[in-house]
Amino acid sequence: METSKNLSVLIAGPAGAGIFSSSVTLGKMFLRHGLNVFITNEYPSLIRGGHQWAQVRASLEETVFSHQKKVDIVLALDKPSIEKHTASLKTNGIIICDEEDASSLAKNNVQIRAFPLRKIVKEMNAPSVAINSIGLGIIVGILNGNIEIAEKLYDEQFRGKKETADLNKQLFKMGYEYGKELSNSFQGYKLPQQAIYSGTVSYTHLTLPTS
């Protein structure tokens, strides 16, 4: 059976952890692989605990204008995100998290893959938000994406800040190597290797009530 040429990734964590900016970066990476992209971002209410998530949906087959209830991959930047979004995964979906947050709540047909994300950030003397670059690298590695596309994007994103660009590229590459080791176990759609630059991108924002 031919694999459907679309995928959805959810990034979740505490407010202020760079969730939306990371979703935009991932969306641009997908876009430069030639996919059509739709990004949904939830603006959190601090009264509700400050949890935030963003979903990046991408398709090679058609322009997309909505998010999906079920996703292929969850990048969980804290333990509550694992607990909250496990149910959002498709069968055989993957949760990526820090090894300190690895949960025993995994359900059947859900893969939890834990990595020393915070430890790496600390050892690299990087800001805590840089954990996202490792996570994005793992995602793109799992999807067998083109690392040169990501590296060029970081150069553009941090133009004039070579040290910051190089740090994020290094962290991304470390994550990418982790992700490549998981690529064969992921049964969903894989990214085309070439840079095509032919997709479209759309955004929407969800603001949830405080009660």
Task: Indicate residue ranges for each PLM-predicted region.
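Conserved small/polar residues in nucleotide/adenosyl-binding loops
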Residues: 204-210
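Short glycine/serine/threonine-rich phosphate/pyrophosphate-binding segments
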Residues: 19-23, 83-84, 206
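Anionic-ligand anchoring segments at beta-strand to alpha-helix junctions in alpha/beta enzyme folds, i.e.
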Residues: 7-70, 74
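ADP-ribose/adenylate-binding Rossmann-like module
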Residues: 86-104
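Short, well-ordered alpha-helix to beta-strand connector turns
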Residues: 71, 92-93, 109
